[in-house]
Design a protein with these regions (language model features):
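Nucleotide-activated chemistry modules centered on ATP-dependent adenylation/adenylyltransferase
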Residues: 1-259
Length: 259
């Protein structure tokens, strides 16, 4: 891929396999990097934070770089339970539903406020600040077999035809293994994400019981605050408490087969 050496090169690093592979290959191929941006939701797996720390120690510091952490000043749970709703139409709709005019509730398919407020907005704001002083190029780690690219962004993995499977192997080959996180979960997004698979949630309960207990508490609070509405539903088909009962029953049944 062609590189503009006069530009300011900003790399987005989520910490996942694709963005990590992109960063590794950019460094190996001698591509310029001026900033590495990380949007922290505050709800990542502990192994992901350890991985990001390792990336900074092993890859960035010796090159005079560091992670630029981007965080919402209030955080995920404040947005979920406490953020005031100002728009009149929103307040009227909530009045009809009988829910308070604060808190976003669980993210939904149509309204993924978490991605918007905790990731996209923060990164775009930072990149726009950079663009006020520099001609900036923004690099995103999307694999060749993922969704289509957007305009005005740089997608090295697509240009290099690197698939998701290849991206993960690139990381493994260079000693970045997330302490086995990708062997447990196909995708390593926020541990509280309601869009993850049932199998992922079952794995969360088994391998991260402290996070599972936190998720139970969040869902109980959401149901109490927002009731039987989309805002109060972790998933359309299950509450976390119901999933907890289901997984417990499945584990007990499996234990009987193993006897």
């Amino acid at each position: 891929m062609a590189t503009d050496k006069t530009a300011f090169h900003a790399v987005s690093l989520s910490g996942g396999k694709d963005s990590t592979a992109m960063l590794l290959l950019m460094i190996e191929r001698g591509l310029p990097i001026d900033a590495v941006l990380t949007a922290d939701t505050g709800m990542e797996f502990p192994e992901m934070y350890e991985h990001l720390d390792k990336v900074e120690r092993v890859l960035l510091r010796e090159r005079g770089l560091h992670l630029t952490w981007l965080r919402h000043e209030k955080g995920f749970e404040w947005l979920m339970f406490n953020q005031p709703k100002q728009k009149e139409k929103t307040r009227q709709l909530r009045d009809k539903l009988g829910v308070p005019n604060y808190g976003n509730g669980w993210p939904g398919i149509r309204v993924r406020w978490c991605t918007g407020q905790l990731k996209t907005h923060l990164i775009e704001k930072k990149v726009n600040q950079i663009k006020q002083e520099h001609h900036a190029l923004h690099y995103i780690g999307i694999a060749a077999d993922e969704r289509q690219r957007m305009k005005n962004l740089q997608y090295p993995l697509i240009d290099w035809k690197i698939t998701e499977k290849q991206a993960l192997q690139i990381c493994y080959d260079r000693g970045f293994d997330w302490n086995g996180l990708y062997k447990l979960y196909h995708r390593c997004s926020c541990w509280c994400c309601p869009f993850q698979s049932i199998e992922n949630l079952k794995t969360l309960r088994r391998h991260h019981p402290d996070l599972w207990q936190h998720l139970l508490q969040m869902d109980e609070r959401a149901l109490a605050q927002f009731g039987n509405t989309p805002l109060g539903h972790f998933r359309e088909d299950w509450t976390v408490a119901q999933l907890d009962q289901r997984f417990d029953a499945e584990d007990r049944q499996m234990s009987l087969f193993e006897m």
